[in-house]
């Protein structure tokens, strides 16, 4: 599983790779070892060498998000958008940063932009659902987006988790419980799903807003 919806760069660059490609590979390897701060330091020279690298800016955005540096993450994602406006990963990453910055209208807009660019990818529909849930609005649209993600990839536990939260937001507790149980059957060790199910069962205190940090960033997806 990848750390989010950006395609991971190769950890070992091919022979003849540019200095920027070497930097991206090194930063990717460090990120995979859960050292985003060191990965940023490895990636900065790569971006200085090739500031037109979309993959480098996307990776930088992911690293900044992992470090809770949301404004720099947004700036990196915007660089990628400017370089490759047709690539859905950049607006989806920007959407995540915007949600964390509390800029919910912009987050929803960017999430839908990713869907428009690549409507067959469930990750973007999941991002729409999360943008709306985080904004605490348009719960029917969030539920529809989560259901669409499940339809596109019924084998990904995270999408059932998202669907469960959307159903809960709509007040459909029994359906939400079933969605969370489905998610946990597929991925029993997801603490976020465990907690939300406990909340529905009256065994834990409800959080003020849905969160998915700490277990799945953007919804992990098998690549």
Regions found by a protein language model. Name each.
Residues 16-55, 59-66:
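Alpha-helical segment of the N-proximal tetratricopeptide repeat
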Residues 32-45, 66-79, 100-113, 135-148, ...:
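Structural signature of tandem alpha-helical TPR/SEL1-like repeats
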